[in-house]
Amino acid sequence: MVLTDGAAIPAAPFFWYAAGFTFGRSGATVWAMPLPVIAHLDADAFFVSVEQACDPSLRGKKVAVGGRQRGIIASASYEARACGVYTPMATKLALQVCPDLILVSHTSGRYGQFSRRMFDLCGTLTPFVERSSIDEGYLDLSPCGCGTEAELVNRARGLQRRLWEELQIPVSLGLAANKLVAAIASKLLKPRGFVVVPPGTEAEFLAPLSVGVLPGIGKKSEAKLKAQGLTAVQDLLALNEEGWYALFGHSWRDIQAMARGEDDRPLKLEHDDAKSYSQQETFPHDVSDFAEIERIAKRMIDELMPKIRADGKKVRTMTVKVRYPGMEDSVAGRSLTEATDLEAPFYPLVELLLRRAWAKRRPLRLVSVRFSGVDDRPAQLEMFAQTEEKKRRLAAVLDKLNDRGRKAVVQHGHQLGKTTAD
């Protein structure tokens, strides 16, 4: 890999980037700037790494975790990726492109256990940890009390080494002033990468990188942009407002901010071992419009499900509660046959549960939605899993687009109607 300054990145696991310098070994230079205190941790080929930790004979081999027959590949080792295996890919096709691929069936419960142990170790470095998915998370390193970048780098690298020594899980780390840049940095030199972006150099760091590093720009969008000569992030920044709007519509300002490396999202510190997920809304005045209550309940589904996905969980049961004036509550619930982390299966239940819970049809003071029956087992990899995986990947893209502390960039149709006062 070569940046625009012509400096090649050496093939070693720990490197950092500083403005005015090429990639080099961390700790080699001191910069007189605030410290980059947000770290993004990204486990390398997590499912495969867990299986290799449990069976070291799999290390260094072309390995994939996936379902057999009509299943899909959930994770592939870097050796397998070099042969053309990717995620998600039909198992049948993966075995065609890589005949000597070692296929390992997923092990129920194992990945959640390793994930919890991984984030428990992160908690020994800092109490401020956000688990964004089963194999990724953010750390606020400001409580570490580091006075220099060398101390900060040593602490972070120490965590990286400890995760390998105690769990045999390789991870990549990105350090920056905000979550967006830290996440991009962590993926730049995988596997076992270590990249530091000093505060104030975010735009310079992103400028030569492919437009595809920005959240929300998938492979199809990236191909369309490159067909128009917009290859690197710096090409986007050269556009005027009309050009931005033509490409991205009303969300152009958010994507422009990302291209500049701007991100003010705080860490979300919810507990990741939740047994249920719930949200409620109390109205400033009593509400009797069924369609409005239904829209609010569906919006709660849309806001809760990204948290469930981020925790690597699925849920089976949805309960709707309504409250009449005078603190009188009424509830109704229904369970799916299979746990899920997608919104769509629960939408049809909203009207049914509301009609049951709201049998008296008096004006309401409050409505709440609660998900329970939490399941942290890995996704089913057989049968119709390819369709489910596509939906899950789309949901993950929407989560990243909307997780910017502003108004949602992408909304479902039921979110576009009448709104109530917050």
Placement of each model-derived feature along the sequence:
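Positively charged N-terminal leader segments that act as targeting/secretion signals
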Residues: 2-19
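Short, hydrophobic beta-strand segments
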Residues: 137-143, 331-334, 378-384
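A glycine-rich phosphate-binding loop feature that marks nucleotide/adenosyl-phosphate handling sites
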Residues: 175-180, 261, 314-325, 364-375, ...
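DNA-contacting surface of Y-family translesion DNA polymerases
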Residues: 31, 213, 221-364
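Short, charged/polar surface micro-motifs in flexible loops or helix N-caps
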Residues: 44-46, 69-72, 325-329, 374-377
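Acidic, metal-coordinating catalytic segment for phosphate/diphosphate chemistry
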Residues: 338-422
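Gly/Gly-Pro- and Ser/Thr-rich, intrinsically disordered tail segments characteristic of DNA damage-repair
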Residues: 14-257, 306, 388-422
